[in-house]
């Protein structure tokens, strides 16, 4: 992930530049065989790599020969995805929080968004197509907490004037880019 992702990976697979965003292909050289997709979870250009367990250490060593590659952990990934407004399954999107409620209707192809007999077949279509047509009760929003402490998953959100609970934080953390805490939450649309 990041501005040098293609440069780093092209040291191992020269044809990686042919891979467009959201495309994937199997690729091999004399040392490695991988399934690579051009996608990511940080808001940056990047690649997802599936490789045999036996090859992981050698593959990683080859990657780390590039001067621009730096290891990061899940904390960095999480702050980047929060800054980009990307959902984490299990937090911002669950079996109970549908794509329309998570502001992800765009991920459902337009041809599948019509309530027709041919579209009755994907999991959750009865609920999801009804929400697309009639609206949702809850929506996902970005939040800037007051103060320096991040609002964490499960924190309750209250309307400031009435004191009525209107939602729940689904993800939260500190944004290094903004130098402040940020969160996403699910609030009552009313």
Region locations from a protein language model:
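Conserved, structured C-terminal
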Residues: 1-190
């Amino acid at each position: 992930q990041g501005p040098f992702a293609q440069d780093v990976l092209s040291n191992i697979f020269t044809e990686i530049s042919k891979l467009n965003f959201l495309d994937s292909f199997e690729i091999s050289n004399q040392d490695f065989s991988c399934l690579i997709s051009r996608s990511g979870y940080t808001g940056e250009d990047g690649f997802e790599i599936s490789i045999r367990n036996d090859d992981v250490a050698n593959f990683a060593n080859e990657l780390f020969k590039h001067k621009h590659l730096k290891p990061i952990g899940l904390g960095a990934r999480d702050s980047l995805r929060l800054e980009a407004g990307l959902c984490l399954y299990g937090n911002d999107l669950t079996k109970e929080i549908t794509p329309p409620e998570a502001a992800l209707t765009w991920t459902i192809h337009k041809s599948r968004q019509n309530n027709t007999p041919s579209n009755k077949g994907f999991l959750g279509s009865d609920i999801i197509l009804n929400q697309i047509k009639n609206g949702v009760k809850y929506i996902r929003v970005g939040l800037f907490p007051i103060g320096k402490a991040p609002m964490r998953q499960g924190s309750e959100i209250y309307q400031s004037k009435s004191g009525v609970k209107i939602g729940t934080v689904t993800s939260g953390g500190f944004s290094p880019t903004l130098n402040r805490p940020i969160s996403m939450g699910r609030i009552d649309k009313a």
